[in-house]
């Protein structure tokens, strides 16, 4: 952009540099799945989700959350305090740094590591249908950073630990369930 006099002004250059810096960025975070669900949620304050959300919670491996904090901080410099993730806040507790909670309105793709090769496992609901609850599975989550937000872009299951209802209950407890 040329301004009067035929030179590029400092403010224009600064804006272009900021825009170049805040292009979407992808960061990989390794960890263990602690929860995976889809649907609408009702919060403590009574607010409800308007649409189905796809949620994935992981416990990041050592040093992974710090790596994400370093990469994500510039994307939240001008964000409203209500929209800043807990792990990025100055007063973040150890509990806030222990888990990474991801949610999306769109299903994100999964892949699975099999015999040293990455194989497509489908989208979120396919994984739930095929493998059930994958709590305890080792994963690598690719997080997409954009200005003021972060989203799960994809998940690669490195070590699958699939669970069924019988894994949560003993045989005696399972027989007492109303649908058994």
Write out the residue ranges for each language-model feature.
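Broad gene-expression machinery/nucleic-acid interaction feature
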Residues: 53-55, 138-140, 152
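OB-fold/S1-family single-stranded nucleic acid-binding modules
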Residues: 146-167
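Short acidic DE-rich linear segments
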Residues: 10, 171-180
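Residue-level recognition of well-ordered beta-strand positions that form the cores
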Residues: 57-59, 142-144, 156
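Exposed beta-sheet edge/beta-hairpin loop segments within beta-rich domains
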Residues: 118-139, 145-149
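OB-fold ssDNA-binding interfaces and closely related basic DNA-contact patches used
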Residues: 2-108
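Beta-strand/loop nucleic-acid-binding surfaces
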Residues: 102-128
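"Short basic amphipathic alpha-helical interaction patches in structured regions
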Residues: 73, 115-116, 151-156
């Amino acid at each position: 952009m040329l301004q009067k006099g035929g030179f590029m002004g400092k403010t224009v250059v600064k804006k272009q540099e900021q825009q170049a810096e805040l292009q979407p960025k992808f960061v990989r975070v390794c960890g263990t799945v602690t929860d995976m669900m889809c649907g609408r949620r009702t919060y403590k304050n009574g607010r409800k989700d308007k649409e189905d959300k796809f949620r994935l919670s992981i416990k990041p491996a050592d040093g992974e959350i710090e790596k994400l904090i370093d990469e994500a901080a510039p994307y939240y410099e001008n964000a409203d305090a209500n929209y800043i993730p807990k792990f990025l806040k100055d007063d973040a507790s150890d509990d806030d740094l222990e888990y990474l909670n991801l949610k999306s309105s769109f299903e994100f793709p999964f892949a699975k590591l099999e015999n040293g090769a990455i194989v497509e496992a489908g989208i979120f609901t396919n994984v739930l249908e095929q493998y059930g609850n994958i709590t305890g599975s080792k994963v690598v989550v690719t997080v997409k950073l954009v200005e003021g937000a972060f989203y799960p872009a994809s998940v690669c299951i490195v070590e699958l630990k699939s669970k069924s209802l019988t894994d949560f209950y003993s045989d005696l407890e399972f027989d007492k369930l109303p649908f058994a």
